Amino acid sequence: MEATISADIIRSTSLPKEGMIVLQERLRDFMDFLNKTFDGCWGRVVRGDGIECAISDAHYLLRIVLLLKCQIKAIRVCFDEMNIKGGDKRFFKFGVRMAVAIGRLRTNDKEQAIMDGEAIYNSGRALDQMGSYDFFSISSDYKESEPIVQSLFLLINHIMKRVSARQSQVLFMKLQNMSDVEIAQRMGITRVGVYLHLKSIGWDAISTALRCYEMMKF
């Protein structure tokens, strides 16, 4: 079973020119990361601040959703370091509106940049139908497990609402299975600092949700 992500950046038009440049760079970086890290997965930026991702194995989906949210929320750190002002508070709190779908892709061709099929139609349609204060939607063709999948994704979405930009950086690395020592070295903080960030985020709940989801049968 495959999956797709359709997303757009919340209130990106509130960003100054310098902020938009940073945002575009971070989106391109994420697409490169996705292509290199997850076999058969790829993504593209559409309509300036829109995102479409084709996921070759639905088991990757929850981890990729978390990584994408972290990538966007961590932008605040770059803004502070570069002294970039402006931006709507909803951009910094939520970062990205996202609709995901678990289903079939008739065509998933990274080389030709073609994704086509029911899954991308479903996620794209769901994103277009979202209201101003809706930030997440999920649909699944695997009806037997849909209630469990919905619960796991909604739990993760709720947790991510209160994760700070700096915590998002830590979580992004932890989701790549880096050790606390390695994260501490990259962040320039102590191992205890990493531990406290992860505890505040709710890493135990996130890692349990990931294990549960990645063991599901699709």
Regions found by a protein language model. Name each.
Residues 1-218:
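Regulatory and interdomain segments flanking nucleotide-handling catalytic cores
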